[in-house]
């Protein structure tokens, strides 16, 4: 497995290095995208594909009276995310568990916000996975997607060739999948760097 395969499912030493790099490398994109998300201070939030947990930490600050749960199907990512958010976990404001978006381990209508940073590229069955997100969102809840690639630049093809199982979606494609899952009020935002943020409501 190549080092870049660890972007999909970090494992072993290479995975630990990749997770640490992701926590740092995606911070500017996450900060940009979060301008389009305004969660309530007491919101219940789920971060899907939480990676090394940096975005969980940011979401906990955005929701000082709320709780944030994270899932990732990589054990390496879960371990790192738990370390990064150890204080919040000890305070009962955060949990991180190993799970897949294909079958979210939560009851229906549990979250006001579900986030997905740099992860939908690797979701196995986007239509079904979006329906799972829809299921766990409360009515009126927001699904927030933030990607560093928008499927419209030449460099995007390079990454899909290097990383097996990666699919880069345009905002138009994501909107179609979201509508198919039942979402409405879909909005997309892009910048000159090719970053993409999409929000949708249940």
Q: What is each stretch, according to the model?
A:
Residues 102-113:
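A short acidic, Gly/Pro-enriched loop at the edge of an enzyme's catalytic core
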Residues 37-39, 62-63, 137:
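A generic alpha-to-beta junction signature in SAM-dependent methyltransferases
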Residues 42, 137-142:
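Short glycine-dipeptide loop
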Residues 127-139:
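A short glycine-rich, Lys/Arg-flanked "PGG" loop and its adjoining helix->strand segment in the class I
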Residues 24-43, 58:
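Conserved alpha-helix/loop element of class I SAM-dependent methyltransferases that forms part
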Residues 10-23, 27, 142-199:
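C-terminal alpha-helical "lid/dimerization" subdomain adjacent to the S-adenosyl-L-methionine
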């Amino acid at each position: 497995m190549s080092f870049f395969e660890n972007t999909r499912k970090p494992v072993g030493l290479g995975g630990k290095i990749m997770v640490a790099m992701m926590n740092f490398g995606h911070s500017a994109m996450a900060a940009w995208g979060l301008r389009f998300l305004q969660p309530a201070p007491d919101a219940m939030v789920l971060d899907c594909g939480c990676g090394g947990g940096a975005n969980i930490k940011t979401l906990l600050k955005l929701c000082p009276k709320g709780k944030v749960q994270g899932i990732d199907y990589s054990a390496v990512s879960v371990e790192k995310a738990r370390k990064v958010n150890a204080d919040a976990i000890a305070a009962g404001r955060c949990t991180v568990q190993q799970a897949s978006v294909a079958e979210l381990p939560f009851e229906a209508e549990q979250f006001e916000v579900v986030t997905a940073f740099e992860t939908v590229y690797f979701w196995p069955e986007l239509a079904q996975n979006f329906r799972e997100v829809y299921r766990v969102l409360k009515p009126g809840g927001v699904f927030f997607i933030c990607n560093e690639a928008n499927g419209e630049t030449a460099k995007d093809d390079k990454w899909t060739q290097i990383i097996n199982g990666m699919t880069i979606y345009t905002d138009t494609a994501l909107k179609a999948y979201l509508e198919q899952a039942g979402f409405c009020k879909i909005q997309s935002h892009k910048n000159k760097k090719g970053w993409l943020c999409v929000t949708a409501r249940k």
